[in-house]
Amino acid sequence: MSLESLIQWDQQASLWLNKLGNATWDPFWLMLTDTRFWFPAYGIIMLFLFRELGWKKGLAVLLSIIVMLVTVDQSCNGFKAGLERLRPCYNAWMIAHDIRLPYGVTGHLFGFFSAHAANTFGFAATSFLGFQLNRPKRSYRVYGWCVFIWAALVAYSRIMMGAHFLGDVLVGACYGLAVGSAIACLTHYLIVKARL
């Protein structure tokens, strides 16, 4: 498959997914895509983190989450500036085919790859592995399901808002998972080494 064919498929799939939206659900997707909505959930998870792991391991995992978020967010900005792929809301083909923009044009000009998807999947991986690796006798399966479903919904909200193509979201999710998993495993190694 050529790059041109892949781009066309990505545009068509993204447009189809975007048009599944409607005015009834738009406020829900807007709420999910708004990072201010995430902070109460982050706070609750941090309290749970310290309760489950104690303050030393909890602090180490919290720092790993912060490092992951800064790393992923800043590198996403670098990719966007370097690759210069227009967001769907600025793409002439998408506009000509009536992309839904429920709240108008969103974000800066370039969007490859999705920082929302990368950050949320990175957070999901880092926090889930932070729990599971550092307290292996407990099962965090329910937490894992919840946090990864939340990450997927946030990523999908970016398509619904017309801010990202499906490919932007998939690459962002994979990138976040990779960086988050690597940082979580490194943190676990350091916790074991330091005998926290």
Can you describe what each PLM-predicted range is?
Residues 1-43, 76-109:
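N-terminal transmembrane-helix/juxtamembrane module of multi-pass inner/ER membrane proteins
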Residues 45, 71, 75, 79, ...:
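Alpha-helical membrane-inserting segments
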Residues 20, 24, 52, 82-90, ...:
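Membrane-interface elements of multi-pass transporters and channels
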Residues 25-29, 59-62, 137-143:
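Membrane-interface helix-boundary signature
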Residues 46-75, 144:
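Interfacial segments of alpha-helical transmembrane regions
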Residues 65-86, 170:
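Membrane helix-loop-helix hairpins that form the core translocation module of multi-pass transporters
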Residues 100-196:
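Membrane-embedded catalytic cores of phosphoryl/pyrophosphoryl-handling enzymes
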Residues 33-52, 63, 121:
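Hydrophobic alpha-helical transmembrane segments
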